[in-house]
Amino acid sequence: MILLLSLVTFVLLARAFRSLLLPLKAVALVLVSVATAWGFMTVVWQDGHGSALWGISATGSITAFVPVMVFAFLFGISMDYEVFLLARMREEYDVHGSTDAAVVAGIGSTGRLVTSAALILCLAFAALASAPEVSIKIIATGLAAGIVIDATIIRMLLVPSLISLLGRWNWWLPAGVARLLRVESSPIRIELEEEEPLVRSA
């Protein structure tokens, strides 16, 4: 299920952003957020390192449907933040053709909104963690931890860092893949290719 969902998401994002690396990075980092939330649930609830805060001893195991629920919610929430951020970066890159300018504009225009939305969700799930049902507590705390990590370390640190390091390769899409996905080439790339002979002749 995870592999199929990741593949479908990759194809849709590749078509939307006309890139191979951006959707690959997006899916990989979302899965990192999910894995972090699963690890938090295992350490706190299954192993009991912190479950005493809720007055509950270590469960020793986690019900099978709990990780599935956390994955479903967190994958959707994290991907929503990622698409929101990448859409702004892609828009800026198409205008100016600069990856660094795209990163600055993307973080500057979406950072506050993403952080505020994550804070609201985190508080909501923290309140849900007071429910008497243990499975609900595990789901709520796992989602809260995953959202905090995703909105801070992942979204505000790793995403802009990786995009800046990859530079122009963020926007690379082979012609064959572009035809397969039925998308147009980037206007910025076309302009640069047309200007290259003029630069050489000068």
Describe each PLM feature range.
Residues M1-A202:
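Membrane-embedded transmembrane helical bundles of large multi-pass transporters/channels
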